[in-house]
């Protein structure tokens, strides 16, 4: 009989934690949309303090950090998001965003790889296909410039 009560208490506790986590993510999303990136970051970090493996919170925190031009931290969050996520559409998003970070940093070999991984998870995304082609073009241009030096 005691096990039954313990199970019920644990179930309610876990449900409350999940709701709290989702509330932080939801609030962070609203703040991000309003371009309140510092406040959005705080909300996503609160969600991650409850569950550090939440791929949505990691992805959204990465987006917020990207908008704040903190590309290294953003990339870490995108990497974590794709690592913790089994959903192909979310993996696609994470790899696509990692490619965007690498493009900003002019790290074209890594951008090409990231976009390639994004396309493996969603081969129909035209934007990713375009970015992949652009990254390959920039990589070739960089190689030619290095050769001419």
Language model: regions and residue ranges:
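Feature detects intrinsically disordered, low-complexity acidic/polar segments
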Residues: 65-149
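Hydrophobic h-region of N-terminal signal peptides that target proteins for export
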Residues: 7-16
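N-terminal, post-signal-peptide region of Sec/Tat-exported proteins
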Residues: 39-82
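Absolute protein N-terminus
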Residues: 1-2, 16-19
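Positively charged n-region of N-terminal signal peptides that target proteins for export
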Residues: 1-5, 107
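Alpha-helical segment of the N-proximal tetratricopeptide repeat
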Residues: 19-43
